[in-house]
UniProtKB/Swiss-Prot annotation:
Its main location: cytoplasm. SUPFAM superfamilies: MurCD N-terminal domain, MurD-like peptide ligases, catalytic domain, MurD-like peptide ligases, peptide-binding domain. Signal peptide: none annotated. Cell wall formation. GO terms for biological process: cell division; cell wall organization; peptidoglycan biosynthetic process; regulation of cell shape. Coiled coil: none annotated. Keywords: ATP-binding, Cell cycle, Cell division, Cell shape, Cell wall biogenesis/degradation, Cytoplasm, Ligase, Nucleotide-binding, Peptidoglycan synthesis. This is UDP-N-acetylmuramate--L-alanine ligase. It catalyses: UDP-N-acetyl-alpha-D-muramate + L-alanine + ATP = UDP-N-acetyl-alpha-D-muramoyl-L-alanine + ADP + phosphate + H(+). ATP binds at residues 112-118.
Length: 477
């Protein structure tokens, strides 16, 4: 071909979704370059693989590129995007490039407002344990592999399908999971929940006639769309009527034990499962992975081994270890990406189940002013479930501040509600010291949020002596 694509440049390559696709394309033999606004561990890792990386955006960075990939976070007036268009270099949205990768293999896409990253990781881990060597692109670092993306030699590719910008409508998988449908990123859908549900229907209809929809029918909005889904459905959940149903669910030493009853088309024997994750919400995530395994005829023993040995995902209830408290004892430090009230409630419940009877200290940084405004009352209810709260200012993620949707107003509302007396931390740089000052012997300190609070746990470890470090790697993919 006259215009064969050999060199692909990524604008915003430091993002978790962009970096994974860049790495896979590199392993497919393409020349890859990329830029990001700030240096990061991700940029340094990509550079170590042989990718030309740049800090900052300049028109010269696209020189020699045959295609330029952008994420939705990249503005249309970005100098690299403008230069590419001026030179008639194709500018490709990230989701379109992901769709092109999926065309090379049999695609399994994980959609839903909450739980996508963990579920994608569980599915990839089950396929890997079965020897299927999947390709995967995940929105977080899979601890067992140490990466968020990998090019496998097998027939399957497992990816997250992102509804936040409706980009999942570019994908055409042959199997699709929908974990739940909740009101988030509603600006994409004109603040119309009906449009959001219809987008999920449209996503499922992008599968071929032989595709399978794996749906969590515990979720009311998912149940609402079932009559509109035209392809075969495999349902899962806790409630009666689900074809894969978890019963006898219990928390044991930070793990979840449960039994799966399987009635999807054929009656399969009950399956006893030990899941190396905390929380009932993760039981649902595991059920979807089990449903995928049933569709692919993966042996039960393989599924049980994969779930029992699952090493977790970075920033998803990630235990950093036992840290020395200033009063001479120790506290448990946990990091989590949760930033929506529904996610936070599930994670707080998981912490209660994993550490019964212990004081729970929540260090939370709200993410986006629009979400803080739209979910204000729900945030008050869920934050008050902790025993002590360290509340940071909102991480704007590029949004302009909104009156009465900031961290200080949220802290004031919590005080007025009389449920808890939060400590307001105006500068996130002061959060590690705030944790050190407030954590006591026996506490569980949970850092939560999708913004810059992700760097806080490591800084806490730098400040305070570690009593017992939890290993973050292990055998697996």
């Amino acid at each position: 071909m006259k215009h064969a694509i050999k060199h692909i440049h990524f604008v915003g390559v430091g993002g978790v979704g962009m970096s994974g696709i860049a790495e896979i394309l590199l392993n497919l033999g393409y020349t890859i370059s990329g830029s990001d606004l700030a240096d990061s561990a991700t940029l340094q890792r990509l550079a170590s693989l042989g990718i030309q990386t740049y800090v900052g955006h300049e028109a010269a960075h696209v020189a020699g590129a045959d295609a330029v990939v952008t994420s939705t976070a990249v503005q249309a007036d970005n100098p690299e995007v403008l230069s590419a268009r001026e030179k008639h270099i194709p500018v490709v949205p990230r989701a379109v490039m992901l769709a092109e990768l999926m065309r090379l293999k049999t695609g399994i896409a994980i959609a839903g407002t909450h739980g996508k990253t963990t579920t994608t990781s569980l599915v990839a881990s089950v396929l890997a344990e079965a020897g299927l060597d999947p390709t995967f692109v995940i929105g977080g670092r899979l601890n067992s592999a140490g990466v968020n993306a990998r090019l496998g030699q097998g027939d399957y590719i497992v990816v997250e399908a992102d509804e936040s910008d409706a980009s999942f409508l570019n994908l055409s998988p042959v199997m699709a999971v929908v974990t739940n449908i909740d009101a988030d990123h509603m600006e994409t859908y004109g603040h119309d929940f009906g449009r959001l549900k219809q987008a999920f229907v449209d996503f499922l209809h992008r599968m071929p006639f032989y595709g399978t929809a794996i749906l969590c029918t515990d979720d009311p909005a998912v149940r609402d769309i079932v009559p509109q889904v035209t392809c075969p459905i495999s349902s899962y959940g806790f409630e009666e009527g689900a074809e894969l149903r978890a019963v006898n669910v219990r928390a044991v030493d930070g793990q979840m034990h449960f039994t799966v009853q399987r009635r999807n088309g054929v009656v399969l024997p009950d399956l006893d499962v030990v899941l190396n994750l905390a929380g009932r919400h993760n039981v649902l995530n595991a059920l979807s992975a089990i449903a995928v395994a049933v569709e692919l005829n993966i042996a039960d023993a393989v599924v049980q081994k994969a779930l029992a040995g699952f090493k977790g995902v970075g920033r998803r209830f990630q235990r950093y270890g036992e840290v020395r408290a200033q009063d001479g004892g120790t506290f448990t430090l946990i990091d989590d990406y949760g930033h929506h009230p529904v996610e936070m409630a599930a994670t707080l419940a998981a912490a209660r189940g994993a550490f019964p009877g212990r004081r729970l200290v929540l260090a939370f940084q709200p993410h986006r002013f629009t979400r803080t405004r739209d979910c204000f009352e729900d945030f008050i209810k869920v934050i008050a479930q902790a025993d002590a709260v360290l509340l940071a200012e909102v991480y704007g993620a590029g949004e302009a501040p909104i009156v009465a949707a900031d961290g200080r107003t949220l802290a004031r509302a919590l005080r007025v509600a009389g449920r808890i007396e939060p400590v307001f931390v105006d500068d996130i740089a002061a959060m590690p010291q705030a944790i050190a000052d407030n954590a006591r012997d026996g506490d569980v300190v949970l850092c939560m949020g999708a913004g810059s609070i992700g760097a806080v746990p490591a800084k806490v470890l730098e400040m305070l002596q570690i009593s017992e470090l939890i290993p973050q790697g292990g055998r697996g993919l």
